[in-house]
Amino acid sequence: MSLRLRVLLVLLFLLLFVGAPLAPAPAHAQSAETAAVITELKPGRGRVEVKAAGGDWKPARPLLALRAGDMVRASDDAKTAVLLSGGRGTMRIEGPNGVFTVPAAAAAGQGQRARALVEASLGFLAGTTRESSQAVLATRSATRPPIIVSPRNGRVLPEPLAFEWLGSRFSHYTVRLVGPAGPVVDRREVTGARWSYPADAPPLTAGTRYTLQVVAGSQPAQEAWFEVVDAERAREVASDLAGLEQELGPAVSPTSRAVLRAGLLAREGFLHDARRVVVAGLAADRDEPTLHQLLGDIYTRTGLTDLAAESFDEASYLLSK
């Protein structure tokens, strides 16, 4: 792991777990390190519950931070995955009688870097998702304009870009990409709500803000901007993700791996790329509430309150069915 990555992770750890003025933590959370996080949660016909030392059993929730001594149990066919800090992998707890007590985090040393990496990537989302799920109040409409979903007002990695908006796969749209000097690409009669940047189009310049415009019929044009980062920054992000993968090891499930990758990307401001990771995770694990919760969190950050509400509703449904 590079020195730059180690410094970044330590700083993130301090910001997230010492100075972040986000959702208030329980009393025992304020005086103890995070030793694990719930990254997968499927109640099925049973229940997944957690109990802090000296506390009562309570329903578990996605991305719940756990401390040493906390207990997790699963009944009937319920199951959950708990990611341990310090590069210690995951524990799977399954019903009907699965019980697990969270062990203490590893001592400082070689494990310290892994602990900072895991807690930085997950802790950022874990601290805000609870606020988001309670704060979203959206008015859903049967007829939606082609609101741009992604990328939406943020930085993106210089990979093949695909733009998405709210719409029908049978409808036709006008898609226009505008740069500082004027239109870069103008396409009419684009079918469906997804458009990939053409390989033969002019290359996008790093550090330049572009605006995507999508028009459906006589409705007003919908706009969102994005900025492609330069090659050096992209290499740094790729190195961070590779370091994350190395610390997780092969035993961590694809779903938990997606949660960690999305958390790290979102913490660095790459919400478009974080969303791609979550959407890919959902394609393989559609019934995982944690992924829907993360997707709702990303939509909240980008101002898409209707989509956030739908994602949070789906997470709640999967936890209660």
What are these regions (language model features)?
Residues 29-166, 224, 236-241, 260, ...:
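Flexible, surface-exposed loop/linker segments and immediately adjacent secondary-structure boundaries
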Residues 102, 131-251:
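Long, contiguous interaction/recruitment modules in multidomain scaffold/adaptor proteins
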